[in-house]
Amino acid sequence: MELLNRKKTGKVERPVKVLQFGEGNFLRAFVDYMIDIANEQGKFNGDIVLVKPIEFGSLDRFHDQECQYTVQLRGIVDGEPKRINRIVTSVADAVDAYGEYQKYADYAKLDSLRYIVSNTTEAGIVYDDTDRLEMEPPKSYPGKLTKFLYERYKHFNGAMDKGLVMLPVELIDDNGIHLKECVEKLAVLWNLEDGFKTWLDEACVFTSTLVDRIVTGYPRDEAEELCKEFGYQDNLIVTGEPFALWVIESAKDISKEFPLPDAGLPVSYTHLTLP
């Protein structure tokens, strides 16, 4: 059976707008799935690059399938049991922050980039005072993000229209506030200039988010039968439940530039009051 690939999906090339730290099942069946629908509805027009933020693990399955994969949602919809299949084509590439550091770092220079999504587990948003700017990359997620943002700030000479929007989905309260605090501490630790700290405050947006969807992951016991049903081999299938909710709290209004609700998606925006 032929492996799922871009030729089979007819993937449309779009500008890379999202860098996503994490390539796990939840992000692929939630964020990437929603962006795929928003692209289809003509509301977003942007691709995602996945970043493997840890040293171990492999991206071979992603490269083999050119980052194309199927999401199957299963559950009760309008009182009826349903299975909804969707081939997700919103992911353009997957990069290893350790094994392909330069390729990863070069995305900081990408003009079209606007959003940083992350799911680095509940323990991922932590301040690590052993991180250093010269590390390629720093160990912690906030360390990687701080260096990435600093490289972008330098490349674009502090241009205020080149800031990024952070959309962390780690399951901790006030995830965006905690993430920004870590970044600010690292900027002080690394003696980064005041102009960068101003750019963080004025050009960048750190949202806090609340997410809800049960994602059951790769259906190991059913994968062979599902691939027969699909008519292609897919080693990246993700299963989950139809219900989803994404609440985005932001001190700056990003609803017009990231209009997922306009695509009929279960996303809502609220105003975030910063401490």
Predicted regions, residues:
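Substrate/ligand-engaging "lid" and interaction regions
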Residues: 1-272
